């Protein structure tokens, strides 16, 4: 275990650059579909509207579940807070990174709601970003919590039951 890594508290040492990139990406995930959406009509419009609203709702609930489970240990930084505890119940029993998963599901729903192919392409890029951020975060989680390795074998990273 690299205790020196866990003790660093500077912006970069805590993974601050991941946070600095994350917030503009989230803004773009909202803006790109709005700029590039296509008008479609008929039954497809109704189906996409319903599917997108369901996805946005599921994503919001999953994100909220993760926020509630973390409580006062919630941080935008990938490095866990020194006093934090490993969460494996609730939303964390479904995926190891429910906040990232919830955000990705909401972004997908928004891209479908706005009928935006560019938004869908951006959603893939957002997935890659969160996957890389989660990989860095998991190094710190494994250092801090010896039981993290067993947890990561039981529960998928971002896509429930798949990945």
Regions found by a protein language model. Give the residues of each.
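Hydrophobic alpha-helical membrane segments
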Residues: 98-106
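Membrane-anchoring alpha-helices and their flanking helix-loop junctions
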Residues: 1-88, 105-163
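Solvent-exposed interhelical
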Residues: 84-94, 100
């Amino acid at each position: 275990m690299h205790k020196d890594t866990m003790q660093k508290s500077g912006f970069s040492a805590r993974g601050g650059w991941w946070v600095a990139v994350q917030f503009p990406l989230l803004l773009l995930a909202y803006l790109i579909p709005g700029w590039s959406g296509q008008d479609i009509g008929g039954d497809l419009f109704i189906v996409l509207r319903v599917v997108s609203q369901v996805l946005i709702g599921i994503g919001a609930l999953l994100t909220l579940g993760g926020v509630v489970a973390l409580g006062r240990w919630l941080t935008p930084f990938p490095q866990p807070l020194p006093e934090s505890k490993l969460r494996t119940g609730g939303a964390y029993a479904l995926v190891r990174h429910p906040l990232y998963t919830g955000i990705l599901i909401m972004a997908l729903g928004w891209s479908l709601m706005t009928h935006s192919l560019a938004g869908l392409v951006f959603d893939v890029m957002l997935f890659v970003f969160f996957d890389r951020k989660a990989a860095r975060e998991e190094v710190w989680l494994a250092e801090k919590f010896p039981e993290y390795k067993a947890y990561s074998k039981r529960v998928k990273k971002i896509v429930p039951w798949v990945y």
